[in-house]
């Protein structure tokens, strides 16, 4: 079984080919970071237009890289949601058109399902069941994963996602887009003892998150600061607060569920300090921590191809309807 995967949920155009026996054969990725940088964030209309320009050339690149013809494919998987509706429609429309032209089945994949399965692309993939921390620009949630399509959300952000809070705070600090990596780099020079930010919702039961208050705290603190070192100290305090909050909630979830494996996926999962702290804290509970390869932490076609492959293997299939959902609850992604 060989699957073509297409990802266009936001500002990355990703295409990949995966084979059930040989694994990932190729992946091609185009990032729109440079396009959106001058606006300080993603402009949905520009994102959709750029997907239109780049998607078919990337499909050809991925097929050529995998030495694969259309006749070699078993099916096509595409991101059906959640995400920017216009961007999703580009990927869904192309995927359905190719499937119809080539006589192949197609299946829509939940974007966050792709992320939580991405660690299976690594050299040491975790076994089901596992606990997943999905932490990105659009989502922050803890999920009990029993198998493909068997997901139970244990907690999620009630306002800003962690990645969104990183980007917004980076903008307050005058850093370039995307802000998360830039803020982490600035925080390396910061004094961890200078400022102390709260760890939201860690003083009460439950596994939900809230990060909007940290952004406000950063703004208030910045009004009283002037120097480059001040900015670095604020960045460090912010990063420490976000990382501590994520670690505390993950540790609580491991203890409450008895999970032996924690999967961390999404762009914020590439944060070095978060990885270090989780390894120490979760490891002390006797659980292992698993990540996707670094290149698959952010949005990509490989994770969509893998999720599609696993759903096709389980007998999934859809009609010819082009489905795109700006919002889509992960728990509603039915078991296959």
UniProtKB/Swiss-Prot annotation:
GO cellular component: cytoplasm
Binding locations of Fe cation: 111, 115, 299
Cofactor note: Binds 1 Fe(2+) ion per subunit.
Reactions performed catalytically: L-threonylcarbamoyladenylate + adenosine(37) in tRNA = N(6)-L-threonylcarbamoyladenosine(37) in tRNA + AMP + H(+)
Family annotation (SUPFAM superfamilies): Actin-like ATPase domain
Location in the cell: Cytoplasm
BP-aspect Gene Ontology terms: tRNA threonylcarbamoyladenosine modification
Cross-referenced InterPro entries: ATPase_NBD, Gcp-like_dom, KAE1/TsaD, Peptidase_M22_CS, TsaD
Ligand binding (substrate): 134-138, 167, 180, 271
Major enzyme class: transferase
Superkingdom of source: Bacteria
UniProt keywords, alphabetically: Acyltransferase, Cytoplasm, Iron, Metal-binding, Transferase, tRNA processing
One Pfam family hit: TsaD
Stored PROSITE patterns: GLYCOPROTEASE
Protein name: tRNA N6-adenosine threonylcarbamoyltransferase
Name of encoding gene: tsaD
């Amino acid at each position: 079984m060989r699957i073509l995967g297409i990802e266009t949920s936001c500002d990355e155009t990703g295409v990949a080919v995966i084979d059930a026996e040989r694994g990932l054969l190729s992946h091609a990725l185009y990032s729109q970071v440079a396009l959106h940088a001058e606006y300080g964030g993603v402009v949905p209309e520009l994102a959709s237009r750029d997907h239109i320009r780049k998607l078919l050339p990337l499909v050809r690149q991925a097929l050529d890289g995998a030495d694969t013809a259309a006749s070699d494919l078993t099916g096509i998987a595409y991101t059906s949601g959640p995400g920017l509706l216009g961007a999703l429609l580009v990927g869904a429309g192309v995927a359905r058109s190719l499937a119809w032209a080539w006589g192949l089945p197609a299946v829509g994949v939940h974007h966050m399902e792709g992320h939580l399965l991405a660690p299976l692309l690594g050299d040491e993939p975790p076994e089901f069941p596992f606990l997943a921390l999905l932490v990105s620009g659009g989502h922050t949630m803890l999920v009990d994963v029993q198998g493909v399509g068997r997901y139970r959300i244990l907690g999620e952000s009630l306002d800003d996602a962690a990645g969104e809070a990183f980007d917004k705070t980076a903008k307050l600090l005058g850093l370039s887009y995307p802000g998360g990596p830039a803020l982490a780099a600035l925080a390396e020079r910061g004094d961890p003892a200078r400022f102390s930010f709260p760890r939201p919702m860690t003083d009460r039961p439950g596994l939900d998150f809230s990060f909007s208050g940290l952004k406000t705290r950063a703004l208030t603190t910045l009004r009283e600061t002037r120097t480059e070192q001040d900015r670095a100290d604020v960045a460090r305090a912010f990063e420490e607060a976000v990382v501590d909050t994520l670690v505390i909630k993950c540790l609580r979830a491991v203890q409450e569920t008895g999970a032996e494996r924690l999967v961390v996926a999404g762009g914020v999962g590439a944060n070095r300090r978060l990885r270090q702290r989780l390894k120490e804290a979760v490891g002390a509970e006797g659980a292992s921590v698993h990540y996707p390869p670094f290149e698959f932490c952010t949005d990509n076609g490989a994770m969509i191809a893998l999720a599609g492959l696993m759903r096709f293997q389980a007998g999934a299939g859809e009609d010819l309807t082009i489905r795109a959902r700006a919002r889509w609850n992960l728990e509603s992604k039915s078991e296959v």
